[in-house]
């Protein structure tokens, strides 16, 4: 009986942690002052890990007012940006240093 109670309590407390720790990973590349891909579709209500690789020799800043995120990625370097869970919708982002070409959108479905 005592083992059953302990096992039940362990499962009750372990399950929410395992669920909230899950995240989906996506890759974004900066090349020729553009984001590739320009559109990323992600699941709604999940934490997102965005791995950004800057293949340009100059820095770029990933910025999104809707995601409340900004991150400078030096030329030739990588960065990881976490956000979410997101409600269904569109979340535009842009490159602060090259706004005319570095644009994209994350779509949560």
Give the label of every model feature segment.
Residues 14-16:
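N-terminal signal peptide c-region/cleavage motif recognized by signal peptidases
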Residues 21-27, 34, 74-109:
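Extracellular/periplasmic metallocenter environments
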Residues 38, 46-50:
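Structural beta-strand segments of beta-rich domains
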Residues 52-54:
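Asparagine-centered strand-capping/turn motif at beta-strand->loop junctions
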Residues 48, 58-60, 102-104:
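Short beta-strand/loop motifs in extracellular/secreted proteins, especially
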Residues 1-5:
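Positively charged n-region of N-terminal signal peptides that target proteins for export
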Residues 38-40, 68-72:
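Beta-strand-rich interaction surfaces with strong enrichment in secreted/lumenal proteins
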């Amino acid at each position: 009986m005592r083992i059953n109670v302990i096992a039940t309590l362990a499962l009750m407390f372990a399950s929410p942690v395992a669920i909230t720790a899950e995240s989906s990973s996506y890759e974004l590349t900066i090349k020729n002052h553009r984001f590739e891909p320009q559109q990323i579709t992600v699941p709604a209500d999940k934490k997102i890990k965005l791995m950004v690789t800057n293949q340009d020799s100059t820095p770029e800043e990933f910025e999104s007012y809707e995601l409340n995120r900004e991150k400078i990625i030096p030329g030739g370097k990588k960065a990881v940006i976490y956000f979410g869970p997101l409600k269904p919708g569109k979340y535009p982002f842009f490159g602060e240093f090259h706004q005319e070409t570095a644009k994209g959108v994350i779509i949560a479905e």
